[in-house]
Design a protein with these regions (language model features):
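Short, solvent-exposed loop/turn segments at the edges of secondary structure
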Residues: 5, 79-81, 136
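Surface-exposed charge patches in extracellular/virion surface proteins
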Residues: 4, 11, 160, 194, ...
Length: 275
């Protein structure tokens, strides 16, 4: 994790980048053999050739399918290029997900130049899903998407997510189950991040956002909505109407700061009462 774009895997000074960024942040003890395998894989990735010898393509495509769907730009696809674990096994790279508390388009609300338009965010293009960075600066996604077979597989995973989970009604069933499961705990939680009423409103809004996002992605796959930012900027008439969506209901940076302070106070009160 870093507030700077340190983990984008795109660097001109490759050797220094490997030593100072990758290995210094390793979560496990590494051997020289481990280092050589990782370096070889990153070098192959940088060439854009023979990607299957360096990347676990199927796993990484699945990772990006979810990242793109949930509109998580506090991640590799955002301007910071962070919040993931780079995992290497047998010379193949994978990306492990981490830190989703600003997913569902809430991260852009807190940027220095906030992006708050729900129509833009929910229709965000699946083929150029990066925010305030370039495709070239995110080589894992870029190099895979340049391969026709990988792009096709990525689209198929997005379609599978839409058909198997959203258009089938499974998502709404699961959403109600999860909401009911935590409802009483949220209502009674003395350290809650928000009021119970705010929680209920956010649950309803999250369901609406996910259903609209799924519909937009399906229309992009069918070419009814443009799937790149350049095309969308040229023709916004095709975008899904999101005028009844308020993403800020889900919370943003300021809400987290205020809620964190409230939570600390409530937690201290609970601890004192238990003495």
């Amino acid at each position: 994790n870093s507030l700077k774009s340190s983990f984008d895997l795109w660097k001109s000074s490759f050797d220094d980048y490997i030593d100072k960024i990758i290995f210094e942040n390793a979560k496990f003890d590494t051997t020289e053999a481990d280092k050589h395998r990782l370096i070889d894989a990153l070098y192959t990735l940088s060439t854009g050739e023979d990607l299957e010898s360096a990347v676990n393509v199927d796993e990484v495509l699945r990772y990006f399918t979810v990242q793109v769907f949930v509109m998580n730009w506090d991640s590799y696809l955002g301007m910071t290029g962070h919040n993931y674990l780079l995992y290497e096994e047998d010379g193949l790279l994978q990306m492990l997900p981490w830190d989703y508390n600003l997913a569902f388009a809430t991260y852009p609300l807190g940027m220095s130049d906030p992006l708050t338009d729900a129509e833009t965010l929910i229709n965000y293009p699946i083929d150029t899903p990066l925010m305030r960075t370039s495709m070239e600066e995110r080589p894992v996604f870029y190099e895979l998407m340049k391969e026709a077979d990988c792009l096709k597989q990525y689209h198929e995973y997005l379609a599978k997510l839409h058909e198997g989970y959203f258009s089938s009604g499974r998502f709404e069933t699961k959403m109600k189950m999860w909401a009911n499961l935590i409802d009483e705990y949220v209502k009674q939680d003395p350290t809650a991040y928000c009021s119970y009423a705010d929680h209920l409103e956010a649950v309803d809004m999250l369901e609406k956002i996910c259903l609209l996002r799924s519909e937009s992605i399906q229309r992009q796959l069918e070419r009814q909505i443009p799937s790149t930012m350049t095309e969308q900027n040229a023709d916004r008439e095709q975008l899904l109407d999101c005028s009844d969506v308020d993403i800020q209901v889900l919370g943003d940076f300021e809400d987290l700061k205020k809620a964190g302070h409230r939570q600390d106070q409530a937690l201290q009160k609970v601890l004192r009462s238990n003495k």
